[in-house]
């Protein structure tokens, strides 16, 4: 099935990119602009990013917007094909990819080698390792209690444990952990508290500890999913509360964390919940009112915005993957997580490429996201 879709995709890509060009046989070929050379140059970080983006193809730019899951515990041919053909910016691993520490180290090493061979910019290698109910390879990695349980102890204890986890994950080859959870009162003990100030104290300390261990991290799930009444993995949840209520409760956590956290050390993950009094037509991850107008303009967040997994029922039951990808980037997201099905990843990529080619996503909009992503990658020496 994958090969048939791939064949169709390649034909479509050729149709999109074909054209005529005239070449001067006496013209001196410009030296290729490599990521490594630019990073090691004396330019400022912003100048480095501008130079890289100016020399990237649309295909490479669009690939940066995707962080995908792969299948298997080794880097098989299908996974290599996804890296080569879709130029992705990152990989996220799950239990299905993880059997032992040595196996995970080998897999991540092979992923990075394949990315380098394909000429990709260095990859985000991610994991969900919150602790409690959301933990990978539990029997072989440091065991972390649920956030609710951790919050019964000291902030220092939570931070020290997070630093140990970060060091362990970094040693395996990961460079971003999609944690801590910054929501209020989630089920399964995933939240530190129902009190915003308490969540800020714990989530902020845990995030800082991840940074000190050499990992990027992610506050999630903006603007807060503690008031949802449907599991977003299954379907949409409509939350009929006002922006003022959210700013006093769930979203206050994010406002405070943005103020105290070091730029380019973290992402903000946006949820798929719908907040009907703010945007009655779109879930948060597809909402310009929530991402661009509220998070970026009103709250002043200039860093990377990543979506929750787009394979979740809250989106997948209601949109095609091409449409949801385009709408999310238009809304202000930078990275789309598509974690489980290669076909869905391909549909998202093809939808984005088409939107870039026909101007639905402008060059300026595309470049803005790619610049944020590359600036973040450079911040930890990728």
Task: Annotate each predicted stretch with a short phrase.
Residues 141-154:
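A charged helix-plus-loop insertion that forms the helical arch/lid used to bind
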Residues 63-70, 88-93, 123-129, 176-179, ...:
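Hydrophobic faces of well-ordered beta-strands that scaffold small-molecule active sites
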Residues 21-122, 129-135:
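N-terminal hydrophobic targeting/anchoring segments and the immediately downstream early-domain regions
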Residues 71-73, 96, 130-132, 181-183, ...:
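Active-site beta-loop-alpha junctions enriched in small/polar residues
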Residues 71-85, 157-168, 248-256, 319-327:
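Short, acidic/polar
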Residues 57, 100-116, 194, 198-360, ...:
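Second-shell residues forming the walls of enzyme active-site clefts
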């Amino acid at each position: 099935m994958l090969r048939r879709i791939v064949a169709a995709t390649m034909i479509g890509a050729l149709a999109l990119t074909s054209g005529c060009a005239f070449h001067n046989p006496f013209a001196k070929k410009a030296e290729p602009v490599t990521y490594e050379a630019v990073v090691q140059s004396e330019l400022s970080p912003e100048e480095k990013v501008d130079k890289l983006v100016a020399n990237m193809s649309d295909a490479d730019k669009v690939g940066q917007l995707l962080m995908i899951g792969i299948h298997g515990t080794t880097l098989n041919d299908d996974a290599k094909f996804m890296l080569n053909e879709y130029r992705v910016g990152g990989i996220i691993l799950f239990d299905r990819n993880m059997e032992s520490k040595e196996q995970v180290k080998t897999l991540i090493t092979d992923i990075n080698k394949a990315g380098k061979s394909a000429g990709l910019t260095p990859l985000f290698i991610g994991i969900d390792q919150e602790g409690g109910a959301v933990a990978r390879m539990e029997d072989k990695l440091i065991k972390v209690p649920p956030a609710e349980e951790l919050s019964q102890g000291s902030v220092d204890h939570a931070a020290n444990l997070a630093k140990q986890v970060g060091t362990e994950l970094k040693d395996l080859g990961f460079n971003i952990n999609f944690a801590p959870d910054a929501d209020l009162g989630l089920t399964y003990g995933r939240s530190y508290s129902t009190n915003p100030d308490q969540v800020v104290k714990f989530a902020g300390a845990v995030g800082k500890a991840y940074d000190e261990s050499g990992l990027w991290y992610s506050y999630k799930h903006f603007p807060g999913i503690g008031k949802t009444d449907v599991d977003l993995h299954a379907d949409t949840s409509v939350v009929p509360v006002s922006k003022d209520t959210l700013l006093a409760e769930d979203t206050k956590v994010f406002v405070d964390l943005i103020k105290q956290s070091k730029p380019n050390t973290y992402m903000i993950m946006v949820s798929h919940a719908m907040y009907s009094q703010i945007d009655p037509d779109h879930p948060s991850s597809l909402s310009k009112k929530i991402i661009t107008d509220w998070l970026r303009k009103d709250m002043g967040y200039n860093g990377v915005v990543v979506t929750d997994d787009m394979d979740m029922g809250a989106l997948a039951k209601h949109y095609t993957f091409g449409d949801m990808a385009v709408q999310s980037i238009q809304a202000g997201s930078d990275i789309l997580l598509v974690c489980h099905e290669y076909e869905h990843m391909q549909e998202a990529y093809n939808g984005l490429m088409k939107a870039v080619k026909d101007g639905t996503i402008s060059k300026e909009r595309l470049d803005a996201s790619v610049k944020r992503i590359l600036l973040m990658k450079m911040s930890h020496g990728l």
